[in-house]
Amino acid sequence: MSEANVNKKEKGQKKVRTGYVVSDKMAKTIVVELEDRKQHALYGKIMRRNSRVKAHDEEGLAGVGDRVRIEETRPLSKDKHFRLLDIVEKAR
């Protein structure tokens, strides 16, 4: 085993999430609403929780209502930590 292989650390997978674009008014930035579903520990009811994140859209391809996939990345600004991977479904 070489020394390079011993010192190399495995990096974890980046988070990939799917959500809907709710705003595209900023330059090269979209706001994506993500839905998180969890089951209540005691009662078993499915609880829904929405969060909004800003994502980098270099070409400005995504529009409001589009379903998109975003990937976690290094901080690009104060609150932009995701980038657009692809558009899953265009809005009608």
Swiss-Prot record:
Q: Which GO terms of type biological process are on file?
A: translation
* CC terms in the record's Gene Ontology section: cytosolic small ribosomal subunit
Q: Which InterPro entries match?
A: NA-bd_OB-fold, Ribosomal_uS17, Ribosomal_uS17_bact/chlr, Ribosomal_uS17_CS
Report the NCBIfam families cross-referenced here: PRK05610.1 (NF004123), uS17_bact (TIGR03635)
Subunit field text: Part of the 30S ribosomal subunit.
- Stated role: One of the primary rRNA binding proteins, it binds specifically to the 5'-end of 16S ribosomal RNA.
Family under the similarity heading = Belongs to the universal ribosomal protein uS17 family.
Protein name as it appears in the record = Small ribosomal subunit protein uS17
Q: What is the lineage of its organism?
A: Bacteria, Bacillati, Actinomycetota, Actinomycetes, Mycobacteriales
Q: Which gene encodes it?
A: rpsQ
